[in-house]
A protein has these predicted regions:
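Carbohydrate transferase catalytic cores enriched for Leloir-type hexosyltransferases
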Residues: 1-183
Length: 183
């Protein structure tokens, strides 16, 4: 795989609630609006859902710039996060949202759905969009392309600080304290 200089990344499974169909449609829309060749890397294990996405990508004639990467080892994934324009998380429902924190911890800008769980966890760090509106998703990606470098860095720094508040060791200590207080 040859990495593009300009790409967005999604990491996670391809279940329907992840809303990757609209993300793909938004990417097609974005590429019609900009002069640069912008790519989208979808990092997701292969299954029946990724097969459906492959068919959609081919139908939309987007296979030149939307890539289904399958499984990617952690070291390669860190590299892909770091070099990406942003991690895009278009889910219509989530229980928590760990992938966004992983992206922030990798010093990657995040654009995500404006669903309540993301707003609660991610605060004002990401660029939010309406996950039911392809134009809203596409517009948020365009905003990322046009963002001032200083504003971009501030968001990335803020994301890294937020991600640090969700460390596994901190969560374990807090859980242990809850158990101790219950005894």
């Amino acid at each position: 795989m040859k990495e593009s200089n300009l790409y967005f990344i999604y990491v996670g499974n391809a279940y329907p609630h992840k809303n990757l169909k609209r993300l793909i449609e938004a990417m097609v829309s974005l590429n019609k609006k900009v002069k640069e060749n912008i790519e989208l890397y979808l990092v997701s294990s292969r299954n029946v859902f990724t097969k459906r996405l492959e068919k959609l990508i081919m139908k939309l004639e987007a296979e030149d710039y939307i890539k289904l990467l399958g499984f990617v080892p952690d070291e390669k994934l860190k590299f892909l996060y770091k070099r990406s324009l942003a991690f895009v998380f278009p889910s219509i429902s989530e229980g928590f949202g760990l992938p966004g924190l992983e992206a922030m911890n990798s010093q990657t800008l995040v654009a995500c759905s404006d669903i309540p769980v993301f707003k609660e966890i991610y605060k004002d760090v990401p660029i939010y969009f309406n996950p039911f509106d392809v134009n809203s998703i596409s517009d948020s990606m365009k905003l990322i392309l046009d963002i001032d470098p200083e504003a971009r860095e501030k968001r990335i720094e803020k994301g890294l600080e937020l991600a640090k508040t969700y460390s596994w060791s901190k969560m374990a200590r807090e859980t242990l304290e809850v158990y101790r207080s219950a005894i």
